[in-house]
């Protein structure tokens, strides 16, 4: 079983900016290359792209995005751009990639993948970009459900939660549901690529979940839509303009609708003593405690993410 991948702290709210994928492998160890004109060196192109993005992102994020994009363009690990920055680099494709990024398209969609829990996941428009906070939720489940026989991920999106659980807990049967056919296709692609054994089915979290997956399950895990619609204006342009809104937003007057529906279905789907694990909106922890108590769950625990925000909840069925 692979060791859990320790998520690193991220600055800012988890949905204000699309997170940046983490670095990859070690340098290939190639000797420093001959000097090249500044505009065509790795450093020159990095500086040029960073400058184009600085008006859209802060300087740190702009540099991070530029590094990831150029590493993909060059087919190099991130470390190679840093250890031999004066090496020449062909600019083929640079302008097209820079234009996409400058328009606000998330770098994960531009390069077509992101890192999550130590694995590379394909992402495209139509699925939410996995966040580091969700890695923390996966770590919690992996730690507490080592003896689980069956787990369900509701609203699987790219399949990042389900595939990560299947790989970390090979003794468990892992199932995953989503209402989006596009998301299920990408999740299936990721599971095949990673060799993760996951049963994927189309199902609506708001109704009929227990018909698609009768269970019983030891735990149900979900990162459902939870951002109030009124927060839309505060979202970064790369989130508002590109990520699927149906995977992010809920009506202000019924913001807990997905949690309520999953908790009610869970009473029919969980084994006695089975648990719910949710990622939650940072300002809804108190409401979640009340909701889960009303729905017949106990021993509710709320945990903060690495930014100190209430982000995860676990509750046991009585």
Predicted regions and their residues:
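N-terminal auxiliary segments of SAM/dcSAM-dependent transferases
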Residues: 28-30, 34-111
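S-adenosylmethionine
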Residues: 168, 172-173, 177-317
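Intrinsically disordered, low-complexity repeat/linker tracts enriched for polar/charged residues
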Residues: 3-10, 14-16, 20-22, 26-28, ...
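A general structural signal for well-ordered alpha-helical segments in protein cores
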Residues: 46, 66, 94, 104-107, ...
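SAM-dependent Rossmann-like transferase core, predominantly class I methyltransferases
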Residues: 96-189, 202, 207, 314
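Glycine-rich, flexible loop/turn motifs
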Residues: 77-78, 85, 103-107, 112, ...
